[in-house]
């Protein structure tokens, strides 16, 4: 004879959960990113949200940039995030690569003024093919300048200079003195927040 199933009221899992509105950091306009659900606010910590930069700054030309944020604070039904990285769409990057030109990548690791560990991938797209010595010099310029700027500023300043393109413009000016350049982009970043913020 089969055992009887226990009887009693079952609590619907969804009814035990609450919805939270998620917002981007202050330096990205504290824009509403969407809703997320949890049965305990502590379970929201570290949850990752993504959004195209075009939606955050109301600029359609930024649709190829994907921003990543992690929830680091919850107040009431609002969850606030910190920037943890960005990435340019691969299709967009491929469109910048032309025949008889060079693509020069460099990865720069630094700790920002406010203690965030950052890994930034910077890419230079030339107008004509660069030889090995020129590529070495270009890579050195990109690495040195990003390293200096990143270490001397807080993460928010670094992020804003990526968003508005100022960092890429300054790098472009430097590199074009050495070799004809079509474009310079910070194509990807990955951030490890200080433990107090994570």
From Swiss-Prot:
It comes from the Archaea. Keywords: Ribonucleoprotein, Ribosomal protein. One of its GO terms (biological process) is translation. The keyword Thylakoid does not apply. GO terms for cellular component: ribonucleoprotein complex; ribosome. Pfam families: Ribosomal_S3Ae. InterPro entries: Ribosomal_eS1, Ribosomal_eS1_arc. One of its GO terms (molecular function) is structural constituent of ribosome. Belongs to the eukaryotic ribosomal protein eS1 family. This is Small ribosomal subunit protein eS1. It comes from Methanospirillum hungatei JF-1 (strain ATCC 27890 / DSM 864 / NBRC 100397 / JF-1).
């Amino acid at each position: 004879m089969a055992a009887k199933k226990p009887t009693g009221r079952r609590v619907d899992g969804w009814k035990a959960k609450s919805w939270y509105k998620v917002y981007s950091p202050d330096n990205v306009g504290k824009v509403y990113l969407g809703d997320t659900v949890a049965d305990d606010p502590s379970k929201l910590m570290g949850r990752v949200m993504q959004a195209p930069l075009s939606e955050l700054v109301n600029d359609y030309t930024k649709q190829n940039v994907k921003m990543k944020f992690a929830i680091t604070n919850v107040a009431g039904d609002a969850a606030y995030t910190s920037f943890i990285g960005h990435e340019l769409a691969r299709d967009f990057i491929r469109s910048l690569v032309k025949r008889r030109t060079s693509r020069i990548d460099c990865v720069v690791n630094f700790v920002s003024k406010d203690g965030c560990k950052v890994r930034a991938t910077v890419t230079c797209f030339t107008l004509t093919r660069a030889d090995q010595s020129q590529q070495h010099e270009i890579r050195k310029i990109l690495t040195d300048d990003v390293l200096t700027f990143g270490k001397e500023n807080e993460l928010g300043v670094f992020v804003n200079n990526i968003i508005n393109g100022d960092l890429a413009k300054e790098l472009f000016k430097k590199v074009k003195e050495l070799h004809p350049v079509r474009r310079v982009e910070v194509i990807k970043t990955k951030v490890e927040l200080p433990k107090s913020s994570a």
